[in-house]
A protein has these predicted regions:
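Pan-zinc metallopeptidase signature
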Residues: 65-120
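Catalytic glutamate of the conserved HExxH
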Residues: 2-7, 18
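Generic macromolecular interface patches on structured domains
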Residues: 26, 30-33, 51, 102
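Soluble non-cytosolic domains of exported or imported proteins
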Residues: 7-14, 31-35, 83-86, 107
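Acidic/histidine-rich catalytic neighborhood
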Residues: 34-65
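An active-site-proximal "capping" alpha-helix that borders the catalytic cofactor pocket
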Residues: 11-28
Length: 120
């Protein structure tokens, strides 16, 4: 859904992330709804972790084991891209986003949290 939003002419990464989550949550297919909910949780959970780790830990402790397993899988998948290559790639991508008019660059991904909170 994120890439489809780009194809529809939305350049902003944060708006595409938000629209992908919102569209997935509104979908009739429970797999898509779960995917949207999980991505929303990841974005919101990361923000909560930075703001209030104790509250994040309480919330996380209440998640079903199946959800925790999916979160571990998600984390393991993305951790394989950590290191020098990831650092260089992020720097290049940040520059590209700024050249497309996104003044926050790669930090613009955090704006999805503000959009989710405002919408829901």
């Amino acid at each position: 859904a994120h890439e489809l939003a780009h194809q529809r002419g939305i350049a902003s990464e944060q708006e595409c992330n938000f629209l992908a989550i919102a569209a997935s949550l509104a979908c009739g297919d429970p797999v898509y709804r779960y995917s949207g909910a999980l991505m929303g949780y990841i974005h919101l959970g990361n923000a909560l972790y930075r703001a209030d780790r104790e509250r994040w830990e309480k919330l996380r402790s209440e998640l079903p084991e199946e959800v925790l397993a999916d979160l571990r899988y998600h984390s393991a998948y993305w951790s394989q891209f950590e290191g020098l290559t990831a650092t260089v790639s992020k720097s290049i991508y940040d520059t590209a986003l700024r050249s497309y008019g996104q003044s926050d660059g790669i930090q613009s991904y955090g704006t999805v949290v503000d959009l989710l909170i405002a919408y829901y």
